[in-house]
Amino acid sequence: MPSLVDPVANKTDEGNNRTDLKAPEPEHCPGTESEEAGKADACQGCPNQDICASAPKGPDPDLPLIKDRMKGVKHKILVLSGKGGVGKSTFSSLLGWGFASDLDREVGLMDIDICGPSLPKMMGSEGEQIHTSLSGWSPIYVSDNLGMMSVGFMLPNQDDAIIWRGAKKNGLIKQFLKDVDWGNLDYLVVDTPPGTSDEHLSVTQYLKESGVDGAVVITTPQEVALLDVRKELDFCRKSGIKIIGLVENMSGFVCPNCKGESFIFAPTTGGGKALAEEFNIPFLGSVPLDPRIGKSCDHGESFVEEYPDSPATTAILDVIRQIREAVGDPQEDEDDDMDE
């Protein structure tokens, strides 16, 4: 089983010398081999500044390995949110289950929310351990065509806190990309932490050469959530990440008895649809609140399969249909299949 003690060796570009540091890297360390090492704002006052500034620099030797590993992945999709608590990881799990409901598609789910890994619980794979082979780390498979990877599988105890600075998080993300034997995938869904942190910068940097299809941004209707989504959209544009679209999650509650709809989070400024129009990005739809989504996540079940008649399932499947069209993999119409 891979160890959490030292996710990635801190080597120079020759690959055989470790950069000896006087003190642990600061939280926003750009990396000791980065072009910004010793020069970035986070380096000011760091005891390692002189060491990093004088260390040999060069192209990251792992980038070609990542590019080679990602050759077998057709579509890479980031799931982002500006604020925590809007259902980003929940929606990542729904995307994983939804893409995998097409048995002709191979799907991977990568959890880079290093300090808050919740996907193992949501996917019903808590307690599983990562196995290694000559091909690399083996993903944990929750169905025949849906594999996943998370730091949650590497914890000795599920309640253990992960207290890592940026450089160590970045090292693990790099290993998820270059060491995991993803095989040939149609979709790799990447669940990220909220905000714009080291994890976001790392995954966009590491996947730059192999290409990212784009980002799906999750929000809730209220302005407090939209404030942070605006920053997330700005991050995408500055980083050169295409925005596939915006999803408004928990947009309303449909009573299962009277079918009336109540808006739990009032869209005081127009909600996600108005924001999408403001930024001229696609609005993928509104997903109503259904308490059974939480129940399915707690039990590690596929909500869309367990509750196919839910209005939330209809909305989720429509979002998936639009994402597939956006990346050039439109769903085949079931009626057409029957005619054939």
UniProtKB/Swiss-Prot annotation:
Residues 1-41 are annotated as: Disordered. This is Cytosolic Fe-S cluster assembly factor NBP35. ATP binds at residues 82-89. CDD domains: Mrp_NBP35. Belongs to the Mrp/NBP35 ATP-binding proteins family. NUBP1/NBP35 subfamily. [4Fe-4S] cluster 1 binds at residues 29, 43, 46, 52. It comes from Yarrowia lipolytica (strain CLIB 122 / E 150) (Yeast). It is found in: Cytoplasm; Nucleus. The keyword Membrane does not apply.
